[in-house]
Amino acid sequence: MRVIRQLHTSKRLLQSLVDKQKYQATTYARPNHLVLTRGKNAILYDDVNNKEYIDFTAGIAVTALGHANPEVAEIMYKQSKKLIHSSNLYYNEECLKLSENLVEATKSFGGQYDASRVFLCNSGTEANEAALKFAKRYGILKSPSKQGIIAFQNSFHGRTMGALSVTSNPKYREPFGSLIPGVEFLNINDELTKLDQQVSSLKEKTAGLIVEPIQGEGGVFPIPLDTLVGLKKICEDHDIIVIYDEIQCGLGRSGKLWAHSYLPKEAHPDIFTTAKALGNGFPIAATVTNDKVNDILKVGDHGTTYGGNPLGSAVGNYVVNVIAEQKFLDEVNKKGEIITNRLRKLQERFPEHIKDIRGKGLMIGCDFDEAPAKIVDAARDSGLLIITAGKTTVRFVPALTIEDNLLEKGLNIFEKAVEKVYS
């Protein structure tokens, strides 16, 4: 009798929650039957339906240190009792510490060798907006005609107007009509000689170039190192600011602190952006620049109300301190190899359907011959949450702290989902 009562109670609660959708903007598609109530590292719980899920999404590569991380929770609790927000009219200790931490950790772990300044904000799209503004400011000071931005096909940089303007997918762009002018999209897969010709033809009107070292939303495509090295040289020749968008691929996700840490220093950016993992779920982001960029900025050129608040900065400091350890990064690579090895064995069984396995660290794409929606649904029905990227790719971006046994268990579910769809 108790089980029946609980079932009826759960159904009523679920229906009540679903009914409340009418109060939300219709901008998201969600499975109506799934209501997440709590989490623990790489597990999410739906207490309404009495279900639990292994989470290979990490809130879209956000909760790098796991859901409900106890240390993060403790830091938030202690800091919230001291000071949550004070604005950028005044200094606060945590903001200053995080800025120093980001710069020094970046240099120590093979990232931007001349990193020097940090602008703190709240989200990835905001960090990219700042980067675009800084690049345009630099260009305009060189020549009033140098205002344009070069971006790449298959890119995703955010949904606010500036970031959307350098995002190539028509699905995101077309509903909003005219965007910021002066954006040119190139094909990142073109030969360097062709890219050189294209950039050279745009040099008089281009302030900056923005690229993801690993394209995330576009399908998990690591950009060849030679391409990034070549692009930086081309841009330096034409005094064009180079921006690396590390919103998704940064902070340990690639197996190094930054995805551009794989590059020699001559290919390091003038600006790079980070968000997602930086707050482990708390909204905080950063735009990191060198002095070449910072020297052209003046008080009032940009700003934010909440950026660099003490609470978010305290969390960010903890996250950077944990991830910026070689032992931690080695573990990320080890877990990534577990996924890659399992997927390659699965590919051997289904070569006509699994076309490619690609990625770095714990940012891995499994590319199919068709949209993998049925696989995502089958996995979810069996207790695994996974997401897609691009049109035909399943994206694996679990918490960087996921336990090996849970990783293997989740991969077992994924294999069975593929078997169910294709056997």
UniProtKB/Swiss-Prot annotation:
Reaction catalysis annotation: N(2)-acetyl-L-ornithine + 2-oxoglutarate = N-acetyl-L-glutamate 5-semialdehyde + L-glutamate
N6-(pyridoxal phosphate)lysine: residues bearing it: 276
Keyword Amino-acid biosynthesis: yes
Locations listed in the record: Mitochondrion matrix
EC number: 2.6.1.11
A single MF term (Gene Ontology): pyridoxal phosphate binding
Main EC class the enzyme belongs to: transferase
Keywords assigned by UniProt, alphabetized: Amino-acid biosynthesis, Aminotransferase, Arginine biosynthesis, Mitochondrion, Pyridoxal phosphate, Transferase, Transit peptide
The protein's required cofactors: pyridoxal 5'-phosphate
InterPro entries, A to Z: AcOrn/SuccOrn_fam, Aminotrans_3, Aminotrans_3_PPA_site, Class-III_PLP-dep_AT, PyrdxlP-dep_Trfase, PyrdxlP-dep_Trfase_major, PyrdxlP-dep_Trfase_small
One cellular-component annotation, GO: mitochondrial matrix
Gene Ontology biological-process entries: L-arginine biosynthetic process
N-terminal signal peptide: none
Primary subcellular site in the record, as a coarse category: mitochondrion
Keyword Transferase among UniProt keywords: yes
Annotated metabolic or biological route of this protein: Amino-acid biosynthesis; L-arginine biosynthesis; N(2)-acetyl-L-ornithine from L-glutamate: step 4/4
Record-linked NCBIfam families: argD (TIGR00707), PRK01278.1 (NF002325)
PANTHER family cross-referenced by the UniProt entry: ACETYLORNITHINE AMINOTRANSFERASE, MITOCHONDRIAL, AMINOTRANSFERASE CLASS III
Family note: Belongs to the class-III pyridoxal-phosphate-dependent aminotransferase family.
Protein name: Acetylornithine aminotransferase, mitochondrial
Gene: ARG8
